[in-house]
C-alpha cells in the first residue's frame, strides 16, 4: 500500500512538472503577440485601434475627447465642402434657391481657415448655415451619389447630429471618436493586455506613399490583420482617380499574403464597413467592380463573392499556411469588434502553439 502511495506521489510530481513546463513553453511561445494592421487607405484600420483602446484599455479620457473636437469639426467642414463642390459637376441643384447664397458664404468662409482655427465650437452663424444646407434635399441627393466623388463615410452621421455637435459644451462621444477621420501617417503602436497576453498592434498608413514604411514592421510578426472596406467596390482612390479601390486592395492583399516574410504568420482578413456596403449594394450593382459576377444582389451573395475573390489570391501551399481567417466586420460597432477580436485571439494562440509543436 505504501509502495503504491509512493508511486502515485511520483506520478503526480511528474505530471505537475510537465504541466509547469507546458505552461512555461506556452508563455515563451505565445507571450507577446505582435499584430500588423494593414490595408489600403480608409479601410478602417485606425478605427480598429481605437476599439482596442475602448475594449482593452480605459478608453478616452476627457482631455483626449476634447482633442477630437477639432477633428470632428474639420471632418464636417471638409465633408460639406466636398458635397457643395460636387453638386455642379453632378448636375444637382438645391431644392431651395436661397441655399445658393448659403453655399457661397460657407465656401468663402473656409477658403483661408486651417484646422487649428476649428478647435472652438462652430459659431451660431456657421452652425445655422450648415443646418440650412443639410436640410436641403439637393444636398442629400448629392450625398447619395458619394461614390462619384470623395466623401467621408462619417458625413451623414455627423450632420444628423449637428445640433449636439454645434453646442458650445460639445464633448465628442465614443461613437463620434470612432467615426473621426484622421489620415494615418507613419506607424502607430498600441499596447494592451488581453487573455493574459501582451498585444502590440501596429497601425500603418494605407495610402501608397506610406507603404514603404511597412517593411520595418515585418520582423517577428505573429499575425497580419488586413482590412478591406467592402463599401469601396464602386469608389476610386483619392490619390489615383483611375484606380478602383477594391482592385487596389486586392493587389495589395496579394502582395502581403504571398510575401516570404509571412510564411509562418497567421493572415486574418477583416471585410469591413459591412453596414455601408449593405446600404450601397441596394442601388449600385457589384458588376461595376466585378463584371464577371452573375449572382444575386443580396448582402450574403455579394459579400461572400468578394470574400472568395480575396481568398483565391492566397498561393501559400502548406496546410498550416493555406487558410485565411476571414471575418465580416463593422469597425464602428464595439460589440461586433469585441466578438470578432475574441475569435481572432483564439486563432492566433492556437496557430502559435501549433508552430511551437504544442498543439
UniProtKB/Swiss-Prot annotation:
<feature type="binding site">
    <location>
        <begin position="272"/>
        <end position="275"/>
    </location>
    <ligand>
        <name>GTP</name>
    </ligand>
</feature>
<feature type="region of interest" description="G1 motif">
    <location>
        <begin position="34"/>
        <end position="47"/>
    </location>
</feature>
<dbReference type="GO" id="GO:0005834">
    <property type="term" value="C:heterotrimeric G-protein complex"/>
</dbReference>
<keyword id="KW-0342">GTP-binding</keyword>
<comment type="function">
    <text>Guanine nucleotide-binding proteins (G proteins) are involved as modulators or transducers in various transmembrane signaling systems. Acts in concert with npr-15 to activate TGF-beta-like daf-7 secretion in the ASI neuron, thereby promoting larval development and inhibition of dauer diapause.</text>
</comment>
<keyword id="KW-0547">Nucleotide-binding</keyword>
<dbReference type="GO" id="GO:0007188">
    <property type="term" value="P:adenylate cyclase-modulating G protein-coupled receptor signaling pathway"/>
</dbReference>
<feature type="binding site">
    <location>
        <position position="46"/>
    </location>
    <ligand>
        <name>Mg(2+)</name>
    </ligand>
</feature>
<feature type="binding site">
    <location>
        <begin position="203"/>
        <end position="207"/>
    </location>
    <ligand>
        <name>GTP</name>
    </ligand>
</feature>
<dbReference type="InterPro" id="IPR027417">
    <property type="entry name" value="P-loop_NTPase"/>
</dbReference>
<dbReference type="GO" id="GO:0005737">
    <property type="term" value="C:cytoplasm"/>
</dbReference>
<dbReference type="GO" id="GO:0003924">
    <property type="term" value="F:GTPase activity"/>
</dbReference>
<keyword id="KW-0519">Myristate</keyword>
<dbReference type="GO" id="GO:0005525">
    <property type="term" value="F:GTP binding"/>
</dbReference>
<dbReference type="Pfam" id="PF00503">
    <property type="entry name" value="G-alpha"/>
</dbReference>
<comment type="subunit">
    <text>G proteins are composed of 3 units; alpha, beta and gamma. The alpha chain contains the guanine nucleotide binding site.</text>
</comment>
<feature type="binding site">
    <location>
        <position position="331"/>
    </location>
    <ligand>
        <name>GTP</name>
    </ligand>
</feature>
<comment type="similarity">
    <text>Belongs to the G-alpha family. G(i/o/t/z) subfamily.</text>
</comment>
<keyword id="KW-0564">Palmitate</keyword>
<feature type="lipid moiety-binding region" description="N-myristoyl glycine">
    <location>
        <position position="2"/>
    </location>
</feature>
<dbReference type="GO" id="GO:0031683">
    <property type="term" value="F:G-protein beta/gamma-subunit complex binding"/>
</dbReference>
<keyword id="KW-0807">Transducer</keyword>
<dbReference type="GO" id="GO:0046872">
    <property type="term" value="F:metal ion binding"/>
</dbReference>
<feature type="region of interest" description="G2 motif">
    <location>
        <begin position="176"/>
        <end position="184"/>
    </location>
</feature>
<keyword id="KW-0449">Lipoprotein</keyword>
<feature type="lipid moiety-binding region" description="S-palmitoyl cysteine">
    <location>
        <position position="3"/>
    </location>
</feature>
<dbReference type="GO" id="GO:0001664">
    <property type="term" value="F:G protein-coupled receptor binding"/>
</dbReference>
<dbReference type="InterPro" id="IPR001019">
    <property type="entry name" value="Gprotein_alpha_su"/>
</dbReference>
<dbReference type="GO" id="GO:0097730">
    <property type="term" value="C:non-motile cilium"/>
</dbReference>
<protein>
    <recommendedName>
        <fullName>Guanine nucleotide-binding protein alpha-4 subunit</fullName>
    </recommendedName>
</protein>
<dbReference type="InterPro" id="IPR011025">
    <property type="entry name" value="GproteinA_insert"/>
</dbReference>
<feature type="domain" description="G-alpha">
    <location>
        <begin position="31"/>
        <end position="359"/>
    </location>
</feature>
<dbReference type="GO" id="GO:0005929">
    <property type="term" value="C:cilium"/>
</dbReference>
<dbReference type="InterPro" id="IPR001408">
    <property type="entry name" value="Gprotein_alpha_I"/>
</dbReference>
<feature type="region of interest" description="G5 motif">
    <location>
        <begin position="329"/>
        <end position="334"/>
    </location>
</feature>
<keyword id="KW-0460">Magnesium</keyword>
<feature type="binding site">
    <location>
        <begin position="178"/>
        <end position="184"/>
    </location>
    <ligand>
        <name>GTP</name>
    </ligand>
</feature>
<feature type="region of interest" description="G4 motif">
    <location>
        <begin position="268"/>
        <end position="275"/>
    </location>
</feature>
<feature type="binding site">
    <location>
        <begin position="39"/>
        <end position="46"/>
    </location>
    <ligand>
        <name>GTP</name>
    </ligand>
</feature>
<keyword id="KW-0479">Metal-binding</keyword>
<feature type="region of interest" description="G3 motif">
    <location>
        <begin position="199"/>
        <end position="208"/>
    </location>
</feature>
Amino acid at each position: 500500500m505504501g509502495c503504491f502511495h509512493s508511486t502515485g506521489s511520483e506520478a503526480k510530481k511528474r505530471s505537475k512538472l510537465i504541466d509547469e513546463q507546458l505552461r512555461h513553453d506556452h508563455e515563451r511561445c505565445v507571450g507577446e503577440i505582435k499584430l500588423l494592421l494593414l490595408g489600403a487607405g480608409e479601410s478602417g484600420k485606425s478605427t480598429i485601434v481605437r476599439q482596442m483602446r475602448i475594449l482593452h484599455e480605459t478608453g478616452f479620457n476627457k482631455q483626449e475627447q476634447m482633442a477630437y473636437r477639432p477633428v470632428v469639426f474639420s471632418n464636417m467642414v471638409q465633408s460639406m465642402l466636398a458635397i457643395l463642390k460636387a453638386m455642379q459637376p453632378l448636375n444637382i441643384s438645391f431644392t431651395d434657391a436661397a441655399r445658393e447664397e448659403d453655399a457661397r458664404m460657407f465656401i468663402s468662409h473656409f477658403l483661408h481657415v486651417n484646422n487649428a482655427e476649428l478647435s472652438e465650437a462652430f459659431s451660431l452663424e456657421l452652425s445655422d448655415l450648415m443646418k440650412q444646407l443639410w436640410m436641403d434635399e439637393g444636398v442629400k441627393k448629392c450625398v447619395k451619389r458619394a461614390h462619384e466623388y470623395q466623401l467621408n463615410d462619417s458625413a451623414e452621421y455627423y450632420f444628423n447630429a449637428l445640433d449636439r455637435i454645434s453646442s458650445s459644451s460639445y464633448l465628442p462621444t465614443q461613437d463620434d471618436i470612432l467615426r473621426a477621420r484622421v489620415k494615418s501617417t507613419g506607424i502607430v503602436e498600441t499596447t494592451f493586455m488581453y487573455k493574459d497576453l501582451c498585444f502590440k498592434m501596429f497601425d500603418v498608413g494605407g495610402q501608397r506613399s506610406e507603404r514603404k514604411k511597412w517593411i520595418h514592421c515585418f520582423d517577428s510578426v505573429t499575425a497580419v490583420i488586413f482590412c478591406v472596406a467592402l463599401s469601396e467596390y464602386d469608389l476610386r482612390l483619392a490619390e489615383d482617380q483611375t484606380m478602383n479601390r477594391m482592385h487596389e486592395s486586392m493587389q495589395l492583399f496579394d502582395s502581403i499574403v504571398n510575401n516570404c516574410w509571412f510564411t509562418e504568420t497567421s493572415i486574418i482578413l477583416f471585410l469591413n464597413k459591412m453596414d455601408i456596403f449593405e446600404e450601397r449594394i441596394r442601388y449600385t450593382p457589384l458588376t461595376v467592380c466585378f463584371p464577371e459576377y452573375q449572382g444575386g444582389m443580396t448582402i450574403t451573395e455579394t459579400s461572400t463573392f468578394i470574400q472568395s475573390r480575396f481568398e483565391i489570391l492566397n498561393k501559400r501551399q502548406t496546410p498550416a499556411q493555406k487558410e485565411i481567417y476571414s471575418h465580416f466586420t463593422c469597425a464602428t460597432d464595439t460589440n461586433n469588434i469585441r466578438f470578432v477580436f475574441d475569435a481572432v485571439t483564439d486563432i492566433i494562440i492556437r496557430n502559435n502553439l501549433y508552430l511551437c509543436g504544442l498543439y
